[in-house]
Amino acid sequence: MMNKKAIVLYGGQFNPIHTAHLLVANEVYHQLKPDKFYFLPSYMAPLKTHDDYLDAKYRIKMIQLAIEELGFGEICQIELERKGQSYTYETLKDIVNNEKDADIYFIIGTDQYKQLDKWYKIEKLKQLITFVIVNRDVNYQEVDESMISVNIPRMDISSSLIRNRVKNKQPINILVPRSIHDYIREEGFYEN
């Protein structure tokens, strides 16, 4: 019997993508060794606010720079093409239908794991995919047996921290890869 291929999806606003995102991607990629690894930028996430929202084409460019840095990954633009608010269930149902011969893994953080009961059609979603819970808080994360827990070093970096530092004219080097730092500075993103 042939093994199904493994596809990992890493969703987020990536506004901007930063070093902690790269750490998550790298750790999950090397632990699961998937056939494909997709970054899945959201158009608008249902449980987030949308201040300082950078247009998708700029976020895509930064993800491409991050992929060059990592040496793996592709961008799945299904949510961007759909526009409007995206529910993970709808997105992943479409991906599962297009990838019938694959096991789909979806990365979320412990903060999202604790909110899963609020997710749209969560029980149906759990039947479609395997959640990969990335844990930054403790050494071991108790997760449902149908899920995978991946521990990574804690790194207190957020996209909002980076946007605020840019706005306040503080340095962001080290918080984002050099190529993304240069792109943000050249384009003047998040300055006001």
Curated annotation (Swiss-Prot):
Xref: InterPro entries: Cyt_trans-like, NadD/NMNAT, Rossmann-like_a/b/a_fold
Query: So what does this thing catalyse?
Result: nicotinate beta-D-ribonucleotide + ATP + H(+) = deamido-NAD(+) + diphosphate
Disulfide bridge partners, by residue number: none
Q: Which GO terms describe its molecular function?
A: ATP binding; nicotinate-nucleotide adenylyltransferase activity
What the entry lists under CDD domains is as follows:
NMNAT
Q: Give the EC number(s) listed in the UniProt record.
A: 2.7.7.18
Q: In which pathway does it act?
A: Cofactor biosynthesis; NAD(+) biosynthesis; deamido-NAD(+) from nicotinate D-ribonucleotide: step 1/1
Q: Which SUPFAM superfamilies does the protein's record reference?
A: Nucleotidylyl transferase
List this protein's GO terms for biological process: NAD biosynthetic process
Keywords on this record? Answer: ATP-binding, NAD, Nucleotide-binding, Nucleotidyltransferase, Pyridine nucleotide biosynthesis, Transferase
Its family? Belongs to the NadD family.
* Function of the protein: Catalyzes the reversible adenylation of nicotinate mononucleotide (NaMN) to nicotinic acid adenine dinucleotide (NaAD).
Name this polypeptide is given: Probable nicotinate-nucleotide adenylyltransferase
Q: Which organism was this protein described from?
A: Staphylococcus haemolyticus (strain JCSC1435)
